[in-house]
């Protein structure tokens, strides 16, 4: 096409110069990528759209760029669902649309007498009128396509076309008055160029924003005489010569992308750094409103600044306004977000699901917090002790421990708490509220976590395992406390004596030793205890409650410790060994008590008689000798006992139970001690030796009685005549002389006896029983004394 020169009037040149010097939409546009747009909330998107539309309207008002930018259309498309026409309705309008496009396309594109600026203004004016007028049938998304081979004007889908006979398009290959020839960079061939009218009739991006024609319009300030130029090149007026189409000699050092001319290259690194540049400071300030950091609204109460979306919610904190109400329960919320999350309580909706364990959550914040359980991420560290936390709020609460801060005070007892949740739970101690009930046994709890742990008592679940010994626990805290057995850690120190304890509760109990305080009193017997748990355990003595049952034999126990001790009988396990004698024990406490036998240590001394004991339980039982206390009463005869074991043994008198059987002779015994002594009669074992004469005895009591023969001690005095005896049995026999009382009567002959042993010996006369046999001649005797007398015949001792 031959080059042409166009002389424009002076006024038109001045107008064009002013138009070219004005800012373009690209200068004021704020461009976000799709990824950046997704990070904006609804309020920020609306603000972004308003800013873009305002800038766009300002440019339209001065007659520049009457086409809505892609970015604005994209935002509007995300917020509004366009009404879609049916295929029948759309096809009926294609012909009218094509006719309208044909009119102004042929009118201006075929006119070779117009300059490129005039063509631009005329086409823009027609397109603007089509946008504003209601007579136009053009819709969003339509386009004009000029075929590269046949010069057709087609709709976007290519299903309807209007052929332009032998039409040349000088607009695409126009030699402007400045002397530069402008060609499209990618799609210009010998005869035509595609034009798309997208998003409210926006001209194709290659022509509008990227073509050399568009670049020239922005930079050229004054029309110049046109010069001839070879096809496909762009030659400037001065020394700035641009390269042939397609060549990009300026590469980016970061990603290798090429640019056809160098002015574009300094702006490209902002893609990698995320930096955004603006031609005017006002544009930068406008853009900064998009970011959440911008504080546009100031609170008069606190002086804090907030963006528009957060300001209303923050003001509600001061006013207490809760304008969003739940239709189901009437609960109020200061923000719509809080109401939406609350609705899920009624609907049960939990849209956030953990891929690791499948657990669902109603709030994304709870879901994110839960995920740190799997990742074990604890990004918030305490500067005092180095402890890590998954959330900053937990760190702030923890820091109150170091500061000693307890902002939540109980008005009833004055106790302070670091957390509001702990304070609310504590208040139930005063109100007695126990809203969490066990489905199995009906037991109530003041908060949920003890109920969860309690249910494991019924299920037997022990999810927390010790890595050292494999022992299981129902609670994580119990595992931590148990682990101190292996590490020997005792973090709780007594300020009085410096003694260390592995548990805080043990320290509190120990401190009562120094204070002597026993706050918990038994209403039945008045006995005091330093711990409420010990009082509850003690009350089972009066109620007879035995909640702990052995699964093997069905025996019941009042205390869990007694059950555990009993279970060792079935397992036979004795893991604690004495290093001195090798004897095994089921419990460490029994081992410690046994070791005092070797060391001779007796730390428990009676202040009344100065008698010492190696075990605390023996000391407490002994004290009842002085106090006369006999708390264990027989329900049949009312007899009292100082020990529960004494009561249990006594009850066998009424029941006739003799659980201990001799394997040799089959004789039964009520007491284990009697059974042991009896067995020594068969074995001949006499472990207790007299140091004076070497005589042996099967019982320690008999040894003590014998030693009085050597010492001459006779502690048992008759109050009637003052006669003394070494044995209490001898005193009782003697008392029958004064009273002549014979309480024990023989049912066969009516003879009376002062002692039950005498009655039993007498009854053998009637039964013919002779239990004492001579080992040498097998002769039988009714009485032991007769056997002893007979044995002297064999030994040759004088009778």
Swiss-Prot record:
Pfam families in alphabetical order: KRAB (PF01352), zf-C2H2 (PF00096)
Gene Ontology molecular functions: DNA binding; zinc ion binding
GO CC list: nucleus
Protein's cellular compartments: Nucleus
Main location, first listed in the record: nucleus
Signal peptide positions on this chain: none
Official protein name in the record: Zinc finger protein 227
The gene coding this protein: ZNF227
């Amino acid at each position: 096409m031959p080059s042409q020169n166009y002389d424009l009037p002076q006024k038109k040149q001045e107008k064009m110069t002013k138009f070219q010097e004005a800012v373009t939409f690209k200068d004021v546009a704020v461009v976000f990528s799709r990824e950046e747009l997704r990070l904006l909330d609804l309020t920020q998107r609306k603000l972004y759209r308003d800013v873009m539309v305002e800038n766009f309207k300002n440019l339209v008002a001065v007659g520049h760029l009457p086409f809505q930018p892609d970015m604005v259309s994209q935002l509007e498309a995300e917020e509004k669902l366009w009404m879609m026409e049916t295929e029948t309705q759309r096809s009926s309008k294609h012909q009218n649309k094509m006719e309208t496009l044909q009119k102004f396309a042929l009118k201006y594109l075929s006119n070779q007498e117009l300059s490129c600026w005039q063509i631009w203004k005329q086409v823009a004016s027609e397109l603007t009128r089509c946008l504003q007028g209601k007579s136009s049938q053009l819709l969003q998304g339509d386009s004009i396509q000029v075929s590269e081979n046949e010069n057709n004007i087609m709709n976007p889908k290519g299903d309807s076309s209007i052929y332009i006979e032998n039409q040349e398009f000088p607009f695409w290959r126009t030699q402007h008055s400045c002397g530069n020839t402008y060609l499209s960079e990618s799609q210009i061939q010998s005869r035509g160029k595609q034009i798309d009218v997208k998003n409210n009739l926006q001209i194709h991006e290659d022509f509008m924003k990227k073509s050399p024609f568009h670049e020239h319009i922005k930079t050229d300030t004054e029309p110049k005489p046109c010069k001839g130029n070879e096809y496909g090149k762009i030659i400037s007026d001065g020394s700035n010569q641009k390269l042939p189409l397609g060549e990009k000699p300026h590469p980016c050092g970061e990603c290798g992308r090429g640019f056809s001319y160098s002015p574009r290259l300094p702006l490209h690194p902002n893609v990698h750094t995320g930096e955004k540049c603006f031609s005017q400071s006002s544009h930068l300030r406008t853009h900064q409103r998009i970011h959440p950091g911008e504080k546009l609204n100031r609170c008069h109460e606190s002086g804090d600044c907030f963006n528009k979306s957060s300001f209303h919610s923050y003001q509600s904190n001061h006013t207490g306004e809760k304008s969003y109400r739940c239709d189901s329960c009437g609960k109020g919320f200061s923000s719509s977000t809080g109401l939406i999350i609350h609705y899920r309580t009624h609907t049960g909706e939990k849209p956030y699901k953990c891929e690791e364990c499948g657990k669902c959550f109603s709030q994304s914040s709870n879901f994110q917090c839960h995920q740190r359980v799997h990742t074990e991420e604890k990004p918030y560290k305490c500067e005092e002790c180095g402890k890590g936390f998954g959330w900053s709020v937990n760190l702030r609460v923890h820091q109150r421990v170091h500061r000693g801060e307890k902002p939540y005070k109980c008005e009833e007892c004055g106790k302070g708490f670091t957390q509001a949740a702990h304070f609310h739970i504590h208040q139930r101690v005063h109100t007695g509220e126990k809203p969490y009930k066990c489905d199995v046994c009906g037991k109530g709890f003041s908060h949920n976590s003890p109920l969860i742990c309690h249910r494991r008592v019924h299920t037997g679940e022990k999810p927390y395992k010790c890595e050292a010994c494999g022992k299981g626990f129902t609670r994580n805290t119990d595992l931590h406390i148990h682990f101190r057995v292996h590490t020997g850690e005792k973090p709780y120190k007594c300020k009085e004596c410096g003694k260390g304890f592995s548990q805080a509760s043990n320290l509190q109990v120990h401190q009562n030793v120094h204070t002597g305080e026993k706050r918990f009193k038994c209403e039945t017997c008045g006995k005091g205890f330093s711990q409420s748990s010990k009082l509850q355990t003690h009350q089972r003595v009066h109620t007879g409650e035995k909640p702990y049952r052995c699964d093997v034999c069905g025996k019941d126990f009042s205390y869990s410790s007694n059950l555990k001790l009993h279970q060792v009988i079935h397992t036979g396990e004795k893991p604690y060994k004495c290093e001195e004698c090798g004897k095994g024990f089921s419990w460490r406490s029994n081992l410690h008590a046994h070791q005092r036998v070797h060391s001779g240590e007796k730390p428990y001394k009676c202040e009344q008689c100065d008698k010492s004991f190696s075990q605390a339980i023996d000391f407490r039982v002994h004290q009842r000798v002085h106090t006369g206390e006999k708390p264990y009463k027989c329900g049949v005869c009312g007899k009292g006992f100082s020990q529960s074991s004494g009561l249990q043994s006594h009850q066998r008198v009424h029941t006739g139970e003799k659980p201990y059987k001799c394997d040799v002779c089959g004789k039964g015994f009520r007491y284990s001690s009697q059974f042991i002594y009896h067995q020594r009669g068969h074995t001949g074992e006499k472990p207790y030796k007299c140091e004076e004469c070497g005589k042996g005895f099967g019982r320690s009591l008999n040894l003590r009685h014998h030693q009085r023969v050597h010492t001459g001690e006779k502690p048992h005095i008759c109050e009637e005549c003052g006669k003394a005896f070494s044995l209490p049995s001898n005193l009782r026999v003697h008392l029958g002389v004064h009273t002549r009382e014979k309480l024990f009567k023989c049912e066969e002959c009516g003879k009376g006896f002062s002692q039950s042993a005498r009655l039993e010996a007498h009854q053998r006369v009637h039964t013919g029983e002779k239990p004492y046999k001579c080992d040498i001649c097998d002769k039988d005797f009714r009485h032991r004394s007769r056997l002893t007398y007979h044995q002297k015949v064999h030994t040759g001792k004088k009778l």
